[in-house]
A protein has these predicted regions:
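ATP/NTP phosphate-donor binding region
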Residues: 1-79
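Internal gly/pro-rich beta-alpha loop/helix module
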Residues: 116-193
Length: 347
C-alpha cells in the first residue's frame, strides 16, 4: 500500500453531527467552516496528500435526506472525478446507510473510493468519535496499491475503525460508537495500529481506465410492508395495492416467511396482477431469505415474489429506485433484483 504526493481527496460535508462545534457566544452547536478543517483536525496535515472540502448549502439533517441529495452527490462526484483520487462524504448517521446504498447503485464501474463517515458526537466535543472516523476515512480514500490503484474502489461506510461495503450496512445503535454493522459481509478493512485490507472481498473494476457510468434516474414509487402478528387485511391492501407504488418491499419473518392465509396470498396476486414488483427481505439483521424452506415462504415464491436474499432493507430500497429509474418494465426490475449488481447480495 502506498500514498502518492499527488493524491488529493475531496471532503464533502452534507450535514450531520460530525460538523458541529459549540459556539461560545450563543452556547449552542453550530456547523464549523470545513475550509478550515486543518484547524479542527490538524492530524490531516501530516498526510502527504491534499484534502479539499466542499460544503452543501444549505446543510441537510440526515432525517431530511431525499433522493435529490443522492443525485446532487452523484453529479458532484462525476464533475470532480478526474480531479481527485478519492471522496469522503460526511453525512448524518440516521440515513447514512440509505445514501451509501443509493450511491453504490448510481455509480457503476467505480475506480476510486467513495467513503461515507460521520460521528455520534460532534467534532468539537472532547470525546468525539468524529476525528478518528474522519482520519481513517481520508487515509483509506487515499490508499493505493503498488500499481497506483485504489485499495478500495467502492462506496463504503467507515465507522469506529471498521470499513464496510455501503450497501451491506445498517445503523444498529443510536448511542454507541459502534453505530453501524454489516452482518452478512465481513469488513473490507479494519483500522488498528495498521489498516488491514480484506482484498478477497473488495470489488475491483473490470477496467481501471474506463470512466464510471453515473445513473441519476431514480423512481421512488416504492412502499414497505413490515409483517407483524395481528396485521389486518385492510392495512395490507392499502400498502400492497395502493395506486401510488410500482413496487413493494415485504419485510418478512425469518427466512422469508409470511402468513399463508388465503386473503394474504390473494392480495399478493392482486398486486402482481397490477404489474407491481414485490421483493421479499427478512426482518432479521443477519441471514438470508430462502423461500424454499417452509411452505409459508414457498407460497410467496410460487406467487411470483422476488427474493432479496441477504439484502438489507436500505439496499433493497435503493436498488429498486435505481432499477425502476432505468426501466418501466417489471420483468427487467425483477430480474435485476435477483442479480448481484454491486456486491449487495450473496446467492
Amino acid at each position: 500500500m502506498k500514498h502518492t504526493e499527488k493524491s488529493a481527496i475531496l471532503l464533502i460535508y452534507t450535514g450531520g453531527t460530525i460538523g458541529m462545534k459549540e459556539d461560545p457566544v450563543i452556547q449552542a452547536l453550530r456547523p464549523f467552516d470545513f475550509s478550515q478543517i486543518l484547524e479542527e483536525v490538524p492530524e490531516l496535515g501530516k498526510f502527504a496528500y491534499r484534502v479539499d472540502s466542499y460544503t452543501f448549502d444549505p446543510l441537510i439533517d440526515s432525517s431530511d435526506v431525499e433522493p435529490s441529495l443522492w443525485k446532487t452527490l452523484a453529479a458532484l462526484i462525476e464533475e470532480r472525478y478526474d480531479d481527485y483520487d478519492g471522496f469522503v462524504v460526511l453525512h448524518g448517521t440516521d440515513t447514512m446507510a440509505y445514501s451509501a446504498s443509493a450511491l453504490s447503485f448510481m455509480i457503476e464501474g467505480l475506480t476510486k473510493p467513495v467513503i461515507f463517515t460521520g460521528s455520534q458526537l460532534p467534532i468539537g466535543m472532547p470525546r468525539t468519535d468524529g476525528k478518528e472516523n474522519l482520519i481513517s476515512a481520508v487515509e483509506i480514500a487515499a490508499a493505493k496499491d503498488s500499481n497506483g490503484h485504489a485499495m478500495v474502489p467502492e462506496v463504503c461506510i467507515c465507522f469506529d475503525n471498521v470499513l464496510m461495503r455501503g450497501n451491506r450496512t445498517s445503523k444498529i445503535n443510536s448511542d454507541n460508537f459502534r453505530a453501524f454493522r454489516s452482518e452478512n459481509l465481513p469488513p473490507l478493512a479494519e483500522a488498528g495500529i495498521n489498516i488491514r485490507y480484506n482484498t478477497g472481498l473488495i470489488r475491483y473494476p473490470a477496467s481501471w481506465e474506463a470512466r464510471p457510468v453515473f445513473h441519476k434516474d431514480l423512481d421512488t414509487r416504492v412502499a414497505i410492508l413490515k409483517m407483524h402478528p395481528g396485521i389486518t387485511p385492510q392495512v395490507v391492501r392499502n400498502i400492497l395495492c395502493g395506486p401510488e407504488s410500482r413496487a413493494v418491499i415485504i419485510e418478512t419473518y425469518g427466512a422469508g416467511n409470511a402468513p399463508s392465509k388465503r386473503w394474504f396470498i390473494d392480495m399478493i396476486l392482486e398486486a402482481l396482477g397490477m404489474g407491481k414488483v414485490i421483493l421479499n427481505v427478512t426482518q432479521c439483521i443477519a441471514g438470508s431469505v430462502n423461500m424454499d424452506i417452509y411452505a409459508t415462504g414457498k407460497c410467496l415464491k410460487d406467487a411470483g415474489v422476488a427474493s432479496g436474499y441477504d439484502s438489507t432493507t436500505e439496499s433493497a430500497l435503493a436498488k429498486l429506485f435505481h432499477l425502476m429509474g432505468a426501466s418501466p418494465d417489471a420483468d427487467y426490475v425483477r430480474k435485476g433484483l435477483e442479480t448481484d449488481l454491486r456486491g449487495e447480495i450473496s446467492k
